[in-house]
Amino acid sequence: IYLLCLVILGIPALVLEFSIGRAAQTSPLFMYRKLEKPGQKWGIFGWFCLLGNIALMAFYTVVCGWIIYYFVQFLRGKNGSLGFSAMISSPSVNVFFLLVTVVIAFFILSFNLQGGLERVTKYMMSALLVLMLALAVHSLFLKGSGEGMTFYLKPDFSKIDGSVIVGAMNQAFFTLSTGMGGMAIFGSYIGKEHSLMGEAIHVITLDTLVAFLAGVIIFP
């Protein structure tokens, strides 16, 4: 169901957002205003994009802070217990690593999208994919991995109901980050020589591959 939602809903949504970004060539706050005709009020949706991105930033900066915290703990050799409850109950730890995340993000973005974010993510995403492949292979050799993979991949059609379908739809839109203007930003950097449909298919294929590998890592 999730894969069907990606194909039926995800591809059109991505192509739409890519096309808006490529046509407007500006930030999500102003892209609707730039493309609207006189008398139309589509520009108000730019403010929804801004508020949505602020909400996402409030969420992801905290999670990134947790990742940096665990990386520091790993370097210190403290691998016996994750201590998640103790970590999230400490305001000083959370605020400190949140600030570290914000400082790192501002430093990277100071070099603009192509000179900063694109250059960094090119190496980080490649390293993450290699790491996930290694962890997935390791998980397949764990005891009981066969039962875990059966639970992960064997469908149970008796569990399908309205809430499952809605959940699959929500996950499809969430995992593709559509509706907040983020994909429109990337669309503004897609040249006319590239097919928006092809770019959308590439994004969905890689996103699905990463999601599948994450499941292989977790369930066994």
Where are these regions (language model features)?
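Inter-helical loop and helix-membrane interface segments of multi-pass membrane transporters/permeases
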Residues: 23-48, 61-116, 143-167
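Hydrophobic/aromatic residues in alpha-helical transmembrane segments
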Residues: 16, 64, 113, 182-185
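Helical transmembrane-bundle signal
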Residues: 53, 60-70, 102, 128, ...
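Membrane-embedded translocation segments of transport machinery
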Residues: 118, 122-220
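Hydrophobic alpha-helical transmembrane segments of multi-pass membrane proteins
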Residues: 3-8, 48-59, 100-107, 120, ...
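Extracellular loop-to-transmembrane helix junctions
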Residues: 1-17, 93-94
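Membrane-embedded alpha-helical segments of transport systems
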Residues: 4-12, 51-61, 205-217
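Membrane-interface alpha-helices at helix entry/exit sites of multi-pass transporters
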Residues: 1-2, 41-48, 81-82, 194-203
